[in-house]
């Protein structure tokens, strides 16, 4: 308590949960933003340049060196914020959900980089919702509940606790599947990571189909990542055919997208000749940071106008409609809730949208209270949204769009900062809206959530659609997933590496 902030910041680096709150806004390029802290410390110019280049390479953001940080995607901004702290080389680094907006490959890179720092002697303290990564990389985990310490132990000890769900924590996917099959280590704990689970491979049940294939195939081709049987080859053929047109035939189309192109900066394409039809199945859009996902849904909402191509909603050209005209039809929840929230009370925030599409004050309040109840925040109706945590502000933003009762709901990274309870709430909302016949489209980096909640998956990379199909079709294509810097869901990956032929997405199946 006696140490000044100026003295402490030279020893302890803090990466905020929300990168928008960390970037200074005083610098016009990524390079200058990362160097900003070093300038304040008086680091010599040559050393400063060396450090900035080093962390940009480490976090794979060198290509954005001369871009304005606020022109980047949320995930790219998160890397820039992290780079600014890593460049200062503090003795202790505190990370508040540093990978919440990163694609799976980006998350792995950050965890690997942080692990390297930890092994070099730097103390790392991390708040995270990605328990599978924590199980793999953390030495100790502190379990908190309502501000009190419940336990401080190794990942396997923490995640093997029978009372874990009482504290709002769902064990990692690998632990859950080991619990289902009764696979335990000699010390009585369940494996918490993929490596630990595979070390006990012989304890898992073996599918008969896999046993026959194993005898026939021997040791050949086990790790090629290519489809290994006729069924998977047929799936690959079908999905490639779909990728030619980017369409899936399933009932009435809600959106028709034709030859869509967009760019923010001249000669820097963001979307390149995108062709899609979107029907009313729950649809997840996945892919690397900067793939053009958020840009695509903003175009669907009418917030941006394409430089060429057309978007039709219900047969009508969106270019002929204003944002106000689409507001009652298409709801959009921003990636960053702070870009959406502006009222001083939660209830007023959630009522704002309904009132602006023609509802009376009484109708708007009724819809707002219903929406707040759906997201579990009715008790916070009179609170200031800015006094809430990021996870709660995200739910407020979702409620404000739910209250408008639109036919289409677009969710940009709905699970950011959400714990197990929040994820479950959002998952139930998606299922309920789908049952009502509404169209739900979501951008996500959480592949397990995608597999559990969505029927259709669209994979994007570098402004193009790489794959478009059912989750079974898409998650069978390891080469496409790799191109898009995403991975199979954790449960799927474990079952695949155990040798199971079928793709499994939930424990129930």
Cite the ranges covered by each PLM segment:
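Conserved ABC ATPase "signature" region
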Residues: 46-64, 362-380
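Conserved ABC ATPase signature
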Residues: 68-72, 76, 384-388, 392
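A short, surface-exposed alpha-helical micro-motif characterized by mixed small hydrophobic
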Residues: 134-136, 450-452
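Catalytic Walker B motif of ABC-type/P-loop ATPase nucleotide-binding domains
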Residues: 93-96, 409-412
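Helix-to-loop junction immediately C-terminal to a conserved catalytic motif
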Residues: 301
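Conserved ABC transporter NBD signature motif
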Residues: 1, 8, 309-317, 326
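Conserved ABC ATPase "signature" C-loop
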Residues: 146-147, 462-463
């Amino acid at each position: 308590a006696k140490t000044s902030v100026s003295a402490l910041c030279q020893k302890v680096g803090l990466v905020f949960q929300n990168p928008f709150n960390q970037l200074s806004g005083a610098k016009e390029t990524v390079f200058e933003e990362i160097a900003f802290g070093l300038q304040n410390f008086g680091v010599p110019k040559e050393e400063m340049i060396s450090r900035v280049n080093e962390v940009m390479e480490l976090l794979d953001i060198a290509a954005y060196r001369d871009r304005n940080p606020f022109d980047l995607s949320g995930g790219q901004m998160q890397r820039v914020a992290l780079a600014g702290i890593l460049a200062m080389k503090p003795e202790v680094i505190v990370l508040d959900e540093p990978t919440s907006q990163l694609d799976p490959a980006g998350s792995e890179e950050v965890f690997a980089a942080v692990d390297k720092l930890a092994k070099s002697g730097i103390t790392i303290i991390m708040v995270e919702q990605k328990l599978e990564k924590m199980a793999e990389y953390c030495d100790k985990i502190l379990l908190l509940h309502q501000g009190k310490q419940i336990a401080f132990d190794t990942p396997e000890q923490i995640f093997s606790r029978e009372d874990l769900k009482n504290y709002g924590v769902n064990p990692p996917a690998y632990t859950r599947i080991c619990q289902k099959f009764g696979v335990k280590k000699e010390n009585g704990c369940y494996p918490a990571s993929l490596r630990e689970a595979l070390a006990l491979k012989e304890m898992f049940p073996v599918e008969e189909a896999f046993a026959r294939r194993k005898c026939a195939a021997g040791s050949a081709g086990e790790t090629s990542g290519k489809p290994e049987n006729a069924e998977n080859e047929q799936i690959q053929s079908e999905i490639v055919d779909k990728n030619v047109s980017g369409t899936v035939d399933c009932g009435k189309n809600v959106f028709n997208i034709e030859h869509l192109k967009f760019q923010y900066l001249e000669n820097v394409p963001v979307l390149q000749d995108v062709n899609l039809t979107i029907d009313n199945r729950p649809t997840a859009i996945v892919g690397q940071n900067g793939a053009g996902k958020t840009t695509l849904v903003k175009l669907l909402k009418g917030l941006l106008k394409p430089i060429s191509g057309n978007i039709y909603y219900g047969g009508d050209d969106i270019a002929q409609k204003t944002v106000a005209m689409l507001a009652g039809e298409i709801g959009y929840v921003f990636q960053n809730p702070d870009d959406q929230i502006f009222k001083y009370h939660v209830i007023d925030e959630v009522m704002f949208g309904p009132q602006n599409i023609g509802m009376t004050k009484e109708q708007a309040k009724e819809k707002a209270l219903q929406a707040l109840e759906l997201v579990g925040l009715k008790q916070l109706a009179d609170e200031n949204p800015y006094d809430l945590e990021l996870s709660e502000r995200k739910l407020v933003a979702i409620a404000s769009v739910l209250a408008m009762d639109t036919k289409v709901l677009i969710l940009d990274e709905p699970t950011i900062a959400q714990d197990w309870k929040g994820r479950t709430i959002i998952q139930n909302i998606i299922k309920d809206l789908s049952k009502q016949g509404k169209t739900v489209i979501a951008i996500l980096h959480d592949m397990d959530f995608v597999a559990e909640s969505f029927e259709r998956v669209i994979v994007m990379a570098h402004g193009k659609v790489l794959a478009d199909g059912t989750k079974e079709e898409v998650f069978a294509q390891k080469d496409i997933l790799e191109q898009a810097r995403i991975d199979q869901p954790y449960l799927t990956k474990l079952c695949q590496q155990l040798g199971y032929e079928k793709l499994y997405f939930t424990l129930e199946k």
